[in-house]
Design a protein with these regions (language model features):
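Short, hydrophobic beta-strand segments
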Residues: 96-120
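Short S/T/G/P-enriched beta-strand
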Residues: 2-91, 120-123, 128-147
Length: 147
């Protein structure tokens, strides 16, 4: 049968540029992080898990999310938010209250966290796939990012 996974051809699992690299389509490879101001003192942060071709996966995935004082994502912030809840996906485990979480995305590979911070403290939002501990870090969140 040649190259196969569970009796199926690899062609069924690969697409686009990922196929030329031998990477499986639909396998979590990266996290895209975006944000938007919400209601007063709230920022909504959305995490989309993509495959190596940059296509959002169509299945749940686990990601680690934390707030950091460092642009590199090193360590958690010393100034935690008031609350962090999930409006899309779910929080599976709180490592450090309002600073570090394990999140499961929705069936569309998306999670949105609602962060409330009355002090609007500056911190970086970071996320990593369990299979790749290198953090994805977005810009410094500050007063202007909150509602």
């Amino acid at each position: 049968m040649g190259n196969c996974i569970c009796g199926r051809s690899l062609d069924q699992y690969t697409s686009g540029a990922a196929a030329t690299l031998g990477v499986l389509a639909g396998v979590p490879a990266a996290i895209v992080i975006t944000h938007a101001a919400g209601a007063a003192n709230i920022v909504n942060i959305t995490f989309t898990v993509n495959d190596a071709a940059g296509v959002a996966i169509a299945k749940p995935a686990f990601i680690d999310v934390w707030l950091s004082d460092a642009a590199t994502g090193l360590a958690i912030t010393s100034h935690v938010a008031d609350t962090i809840t999930a409006s899309v996906g779910s929080v599976w485990h709180v490592n450090t209250a309002a600073a570090s979480l394990k999140v499961q995305t929705s069936a569309a590979g998306v999670a949105t966290l609602v962060v409330t911070d009355t002090h609007k403290t500056a911190w970086y939002t970071c996320a990593a796939l369990g299979i790749d501990p290198r953090p994805n870090v977005i810009h410094l969140m500050a007063t202007g990012d909150f509602g």
